[in-house]
Each structure stands twice: as structure tokens, then as C-alpha cells.
């Protein structure tokens, strides 16, 4: 139960107060003693992070100047209870923007926002500041350069988050003036800074997985990134403007405002500075967005299927690809003129502070894998593993070039297997002959000759090959004997499954193997190596599910026979 506010205390409420930007706002409000702060969030109790111990928030909680109340915005009675005695509400709560679940986003961003408005009116809150997003004017297709608040909402938004934030924003602006309530909307662009749990951690995870070397798009798209302390400052400016009275509050109320650092920068240059500062490789390889989009759709579809079995929310989604390849810059002149907003931390200083705050994620701090990965062990750990896992980039690119050459010269022409093989042997013979007649030096460069020993099969290799053939023959004979006895149903089904798989594989053309199989081989093992834990957990869940039903099926099929 929240203690009642005394006459001398001025209380404000921050919904979603344990979120990234909200934490910085709470700390600013408490540090400068602007308000007593009531944090409203979903968790049943507040749990301070280690770095918050003995800090401003910890001291505020102990002194009573900061309160925590558990509240679900979808329950109006809980919202009303949280707002009792408050003069100002900073409505910052929202689901993760990467979760493209319309029902969840709508229930919080629209229905929850309506509950916030109604509760403010019911308990007499004077000012309501809503944290919106620049994505409310983004259609996911067309870039935005120096966008202003005069831009209309698009017919179709990039995702459910953007669409529902736009609906919530409309509700907030229409509520201005109800029972004396003054409202406005803040649209902070691409927030970054200490305490971020999405941008920098995702960037570092990509770097450690070897994916940060890629640039999606042409790399020239501009962005407005906003340091988190400037976002908190913008909320304070909005509250002060609404509280000023007269023309200032009249002009400020019922409006939306873009908030930026007022220093546009190329998106990939910003990412490069963060990566470079943390000791990782800068992105340099450009991949067109139209190539990444089908992959992103496939990842999103996979998540819809495997999400219930523990798959984490993917960062590569169609909406993210659009965001990474488009320009998005905004004009903050209106916020400057009507709210008195100006950034208090410059962009480069914000980047420096952010890098310093994530020192535990630097390249030298990551734990090393002991021994080869499971994917490498599956592939034998030799040259094949190094090639398919891109360990030796030169070797991998040479292998890809050779396979592409084989495809276009022998497979794509529609040749039969015998014709393709004869052509390949012809090319090999011509190459070896010409290579043999070349002089040892050409224009001062030494020509490395292929020694005859390369084509010689040693006695040990011959012995090993013979043992492999004999072992395979004995294994086959043993399997046939087991089948002849007719007792092992499990083994019978395994044999049937393998033979059916081979028959299906035999129906696949050489063309399909090259076009579909080889690209998958060069990607599947690499993906498995990078996401080994996640994939293994999904496999374990599937096996557990299969085992639960295996005994029932077996009993139904063969139980009656045993009873007979």
C-alpha cells in the first residue's frame, strides 16, 4: 500500500520504471529532487542491480522518497491505485519492440494507455507525458530525412509495435484538456547508453558470432541516435513546459516531439565506433537488403514454429532489416522551441560513456571455447571442417569458386553423370599436363610443381582402406542376419527409414544438390556452431516430446500381438 502524499511532497509516477530509459529518468528526478518518485512496473517487487546498490535509487528507497508498486497497465484498478496522490505521470511502459505480437502490443500500448489516461482523469493527475517512438511515422519502406512532426501516420506501419504506439499516441493527444489534464508525447530516436539491454549486447553477440563484419544495405543510411540521459532530460523539459502555465504550456500541450542528439550520423559508422571501442572488428562486407529480407522472413517463420519450445526472440526480422538499411533522421526544432530542449551530452561523449559502461563485454573478456566445437567434430575436424565452418577464409572461397566452376561447366549444361565425369577428367588431365611442361620459373616467380607422391597411396593408407571396406561388409551382413530373425522391430524401422531416405536422396538431381544442398552445407554447419546451445535445447525438447508418445504408439501397434 502506497503511503499517502503529504502536503509538502510532490509525487510523480513512472510507468515501466525499471526499463532502460525509465531508470535514467527516475535517477535524474531523484538526484535533483524534482519529485518523489513512484515506480510502477510488472515485477512483484523491485530488485536492484549490483551497480545500483548504495546509489541514488537505493538511498531513495530507504528514505521513502522513492516507492515501488507492482502494477499491470491492463488492469485499471491497479493503475488507479498506483496513481493516487500523483501530480505527474511519465508513461514509459511498453513491451519489447522486437516482439511482433499484435495482441500483446495492443493490450499494453493501446488498452493499457487508455487505462493510464482514465486513471489520470479519475485521480486528478495534472500532467501526463507519454514516451512514444519515431517509428509511428515510419512505413518500413521509405527512409526519413529530417522528418518533422507534420508527417502523417503511414497507412501501414513496419510492425505491431509501431502501429500500436501510434494508436496510443493519438489517445494521449486527444486526452489533452480532460479534467484539466495536460498531455504531450515524446518521440526519442534510437536510444543508446549505459544500462542498454538490447543494442550493445546484441551487437557484441553478433560480433562474437562473427556476424558483425556485415553491412546490410549500402552503408550510407543516416540515423539519429539519442543518448539516454538526453532522453531523460527531454521528459523533464516536457514536464516543466506543461507546468509553466500561460502560452508556454498552451503551446506545449497536446503535441508530439521528436527528440534526438541533433547530430545525425551514418548508421554503420555509429555501429563501427561502438564495436571498435569494445575491441571488435568493424563491419566491412556489404550485403544488399533484398538478399537479407527472405532470410529474415524465414527466421521469423522459424520462431513462430519453435518459439513455444524455447527458441529465443530472433534479432534478424524483416522489420529489423528495413530499420538497418533505411535512413531515419528527425528535426528536433519543435522540441527546442516549445519545450526548451537541447542535448546535455554530445554524441561522441555519449558513445565514450557507453563503451566505458560495457567494459565487461570487450573482446578480451569473452570466455573461450575449450576444444573444437561439436560441428567441427561432426565434420572430422580436418580441412573439410575448416572449409565448411569458414575457419580458413581463403580455403573456403577457393572451394566455393571450384564448386561454382564445376556447376556451370558440367552440371548446368544438363550433362549425364558419365559425360560430366569425362569432362572433369579431361580438364584435370589438360591442367596436369600443362602444369607439368611449365618451366620452374616464369618472370622470376617460382612455379610449385605437384610431386608424384601426391598421387601415391601408401601401404598404411591401403591397409586402412581395406579395413574400412571389410568392416562395412561385416556390418551389413550382421544387419541382414538380425533382420532374418524377425524379432527386433526397432532395428527394422531404422533400416526402413534409412532405405526410404536413400531412395528419396537418389531421386534428387545433381543440379538440385549443387543449387540447394551445397549452399545449405556451407551455412548449416556454421549456424549450428554459432547457435549450438539453442539448437541442442530445441532437439532435446523435441526428443522428449517424441519419447512421451513413442511408447503409446508402440503399444497400440504391437501390444495386441504380444498378448496373442
Curated annotation (Swiss-Prot):
Which membrane topology describes this protein? Multi-pass membrane protein
Q: Which residues form the Reticulon domain?
A: 384-564
- Name of the top EC class for this enzyme: oxidoreductase
Q: What are the protein's UniProt keywords?
A: Endoplasmic reticulum, Glycoprotein, Lipid biosynthesis, Lipid metabolism, Membrane, NAD, Oxidoreductase, Steroid biosynthesis, Steroid metabolism, Sterol biosynthesis, Sterol metabolism, Transmembrane, Transmembrane helix
Q: Which Pfam families match?
A: 3Beta_HSD, Reticulon
**Active site positions:** 165
Disulfide bond sites: none
Q: What is the E.C. number?
A: 1.1.1.418
Q: Where does NAD(+) bind?
A: 16-21, 161, 165
Question: Does this UniProt record's set of keywords contain Transmembrane helix?
Answer: yes
An annotated GO BP: sterol biosynthetic process
User: Which GO MF terms does the UniProt record name?
Assistant: 3-beta-hydroxysteroid dehydrogenase (NAD+)/C4-decarboxylase activity
Cellular-component GO terms for this entry: endoplasmic reticulum; endoplasmic reticulum membrane; membrane
Which pathway, metabolic or otherwise, does it act in?
Answer: Steroid biosynthesis; zymosterol biosynthesis; zymosterol from lanosterol: step 4/6
Q: Which family does the record assign?
A: Belongs to the 3-beta-HSD family.
Protein name according to UniProt: 3beta-hydroxysteroid-dehydrogenase/decarboxylase isoform 2
